[in-house]
Amino acid sequence: MTDPFTSDGAKMPPKPFTVEEGRRQVRSFVLRQGRFTPAQQRAFDDLWPRFGLDYTGAPRDLAATFGRDAHKVLEIGFGNGAALRFAAQQDPSRDYIGIEVHAPGVGRLLNALDEDGSTHVRLYHHDAVEVLEHEIADGALDEVRIYFPDPWHKKRHNKRRLIQPAFAQLLVRKLREGGRLHAATDWADYAEQMWDVLDATPGLVNRAGPRGHVERPAWRPQTHFETRGQKLGHGVWDLLYDRDSGIGNRKGNCPRRPDNPQRPQFSLCQFPIPDSPFPAPNGHRADADQRYEARPRAGRFHDGDVPVRAHSRRRGGIDRAGGLGRHRTGGAGRIVRRFLR
C-alpha cells in the first residue's frame, strides 16, 4: 500500500473531491497532524496486505475480495475503529468495509483486527467519495453507516459537511433495493441538515417518519465522539433510512407542507424500528440547544459587576484594565477595541 507518510515524515493527504458538480473542489475533511505510533506504523507495514484495500480507481469485485457472497456493510469515517470492530465481532456473517483518511485510526484498527483474528473486514485509507464513485459498483452495498461525521459547525464551513444532496444521491446508487443507511450525529444543526437532505432524496425512506430519529440500535456501540458530545450537553440523533425506489420521498409522489409546498412533509410508508437494549438518546433538540447556550464560556471575566467577553483568539488580547472605550494594539498591529456585552 501507499505509506501514509512520505520519506521525510510528512503526511500524504488524499486528493480533494467535488461536493457539487460544477463547483470548486471542497473537502469534507482536513488531515490534522496526530501522533502516529511505531506500533501503528508496523501495522501498516505488516497487516495492510491482509486487511487493506489499495485504491486503484477501478471497479472492485467484493465477492472475490472476501471470498464469499455475503451482505456488505460500509462504514465511512470509522475513526479509531471501535464501532466497526464491535460490529464485526457481533455479526461475523456479514462482510465489513471501513474507510478512514486519518492514518493513526487505521493503524489502530489494523492491530485490533489482527488481535481478533478477523477475516471479514477490509479497510481503505482513502477519500470515501472517490472509493464510492470508482470502486464500489451500483447496488453492491446492503448498508452504509456514517457515525458522527465532522459537523463543521461554523456557518462558513457548512459546505464541507459530508451529507450533501450530491453525496446522498451517490449513496442511493450504491445501496441495493431494500438496503439501509444509518447516520448518527450529536449536533442538532447537523441533524437538521441531514433531515433536509436525506428526507428529500428520491429512493430514501425515513423509518421514523418525517424528520424522525430512532433510539440507538443494538449494532452501534457508544463511540468516543458520542461520549464527548454528551459531556458537552449535546443530544444524539440516529437516523435510519431504507433504500426504496418505488415509494417514499419522490417529487410528485409525496404530500407537501401547506406552508412550504416545495418541501416534503412525510413519506408514504414507514417500517418497524428494531428493538434496542440501549436507552433513548438524551434530550430533545430544544433541550440540547438550551444546554449548549447555558454551557460555561471560556474567556469570560468580570470588571466589577459588568460581564465582559475577552477576544482570547487574538494575539495581544484585550486590555482588561482599561475603561469603556479604551483600546490597544493587537498582535498583528490591529486596533482591538473593547466592547461590553
Swiss-Prot record:
One of the record's GO molecular function terms: tRNA (guanine(46)-N7)-methyltransferase activity
Keyword Transferase: yes
CDD domains according to UniProt: AdoMet_MTases
Keyword ATP-binding appears in the UniProt entry: no
Region (Interaction with RNA) location: 156-161
Pathway: tRNA modification; N(7)-methylguanine-tRNA biosynthesis
Residues bound to substrate: 154, 186
Protein keywords: Methyltransferase, S-adenosyl-L-methionine, Transferase, tRNA processing
Secretion signal span: none
Annotated catalytic residues: 150
GO cellular component: tRNA methyltransferase complex
Sites where the protein binds S-adenosyl-L-methionine: 75, 100, 127, 150
InterPro entries (alphabetical): SAM-dependent_MTases_sf (IPR029063), tRNA_(Gua-N-7)_MeTrfase_Trmb (IPR003358), tRNA_methyltr_TrmB_bact (IPR055361)
EC number(s) from the headed UniProt entry: 2.1.1.33
Reaction catalysis annotation: guanosine(46) in tRNA + S-adenosyl-L-methionine = N(7)-methylguanosine(46) in tRNA + S-adenosyl-L-homocysteine
Family classification: Belongs to the class I-like SAM-binding methyltransferase superfamily. TrmB family.
NCBIfam families registered for this protein in UniProt: tRNA (guanosine(46)-N7)-methyltransferase TrmB
Protein purpose: Catalyzes the formation of N(7)-methylguanine at position 46 (m7G46) in tRNA.
Designated name of the protein: tRNA (guanine-N(7)-)-methyltransferase
